[in-house]
Amino acid sequence: IMRDNKISLGKIQAAGYQLTPSNDMIYNSLSVQFRDEIREESATEWETLLDTLAAIKPFFFRNHITGATEIFIQDLKNNAYLINAAGRVLWKVPLGERINGVVYMIDYYRNGKYQLLFAGRNNLHLLDRNGNYVERYPVKLRSPSTNPPALFDYDNNRNYRILIAGEDRMIYAYDRSGSVVKGWKPFKTVSTVSSEIS
């Protein structure tokens, strides 16, 4: 019984039991008081404060120098942060717009060093591990995006293609440098695309 009711029993703040004899009888009374709120100790190894609340779920980014996992996140003021494995903020970059969906870890220079690729409503962003934009980025999108970017590497040679749907209901394809793919003919969709293209 104790094991099955561990959560409920953990909420007990005080308990009392009383036996009272009266007129050849013994009366029992049990009084239990429960806590309104239980505060649990934090089991985290570290905590880091952002300027405000997180706006997106964290993305885990591999440090190509140390192999350690770092955390990329954006707050409600549209600042992007890279946080190391000890919880220290390595950098903070104002983006000017909310990240739309997924963040990709890519090898833009094809040298084993990674960058962060993502899109906002109006721009395609590519940041290096130090929080600097890769040349030519941010890239203004042809039409404000309505969905997260989709990343493709057809030949596994890091010649990336990025597909994004626009507010104009057209599907656009960009290459790794942010240019529209030569030979790609944007096509119109029947309705607005809000999910990632696959």
Regions found by a protein language model. Name each.
Residues D4:
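Charge-dense polyanion-binding interfaces
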Residues S8-Q13, T20, M25-S198:
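Extracytoplasmic/lumenal domain signature
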